[in-house]
């Protein structure tokens, strides 16, 4: 039986289909005649050193989903590993010769299209690597699919699992930039299944949008209690995608073999690593991952907003409230905005304007040109300046004009770290009855806190 499940939906699933039958027959359907076999992909760098994968017995591994074993490529007769039903502990060829089960019409016509296939192919040509950590690490590329052929009114559950490609452990040879077999595989990790958090849902909901498993995390912690997928480092794995029809019949366990359909994409196989081995994989991940901007070659002014942990909430406020006319459109702005919103959700930061005290503080820290939430009055009533404009000393400005807008988002240095010598933006007992002073050596601070519009009779100290 499954030792750990990454979603509370197991209880519901057990009412609709027998998990044991699902896990056992999932493997059988893959290795049956006409099914999927884990043979080397075209251009797979591993195939240079491993011309074929030897068939192995499922009993060698303790995976509740069995062990997906490939078919020999040396011209031998077709054979596949028999999947042992939990509790039986025996293997044989009967299940391999078993006639394929006729699928329920609710799942028979379902087809799945892998999103970002070109990117997956590019990684696969190099030999995809996925980082595993103790705390858990998300996959990149993210496993995303588009589903067709579902019954719009039927309920479905979507889940993923990972099976070893073979029973070998690998090492990376840096002198030849290739993977080599280092020996037999380590003891198998506990088999786990990741349920999509929206499961179960109607077919219409699944089909109207791309299904993304962006919450799935990989770990090498055998004692993990967060429901992450546990993998062995330096081993190869094949992700599998399963669609399970939620059968409302009371005796649905009798139809467990009919009510699911499994999809395997060869280009998504990968090697689990604790650190990237192939430098070309590292470069490709940096170039294609929208959240790896901090590792790219960029202007030095860009790095604080990507690496300073306290700058994200402030930058989000500027990004949401900035004047769209103040900066010209740039290529990829929509994609960057989507990635930033994704990162905001993932970072789980606290709301910026949760209480009045925070709003008061933000109204004094932010530029006077930015709208202040909660109906607060900006400190300056003078002519507002664009939120992205950084006023420089006239003596330091060169004659060469700036032909491009430097940054899409303001840097934390411009708006937070630039005015290092300004007075405190919050009230202090010693500050009474006078506005903020212009700083003769820091025009940016003078522009941020202008005393021209400060009310003369207002006391900034405690009342």
From Swiss-Prot:
Pfam families, per the entry: T-box (PF00907)
Polar residues bias locations: 323-332
SMART domains assigned to the protein according to its UniProt record, in alphabetical order: TBOX (SM00425)
Stored SUPFAM superfamilies: p53-like transcription factors (SSF49417)
InterPro entries: p53-like_TF_DNA-bd_sf, T-box_DNA-bd, T-box_sf, TF_T-box, TF_T-box_CS
Record keywords, A-Z: Activator, Developmental protein, DNA-binding, Nucleus, Transcription, Transcription regulation
Metal-binding is among the record's keywords: no
PROSITE patterns: TBOX_1, TBOX_2, TBOX_3
Residues covered by region (Disordered): 39-58, 75-102, 320-343, 367-406
Any single GO BP term: cellular response to retinoic acid
Positions of short motif Nuclear localization signal: 420-431
DNA-binding region of this protein: 119-297
Transmembrane segments: none
Biased composition (Low complexity): 75-96, 367-380
PANTHER family xref list: T-BOX PROTEIN-RELATED, T-BOX TRANSCRIPTION FACTOR TBX1
Domain commentary: The C-terminus acts as a transcriptional activation domain.
Known partners and oligomeric status: Binds DNA as a dimer. Interacts with dscr6/ripply3.
Full protein name: T-box transcription factor TBX1-B
Organism: Xenopus laevis (African clawed frog)
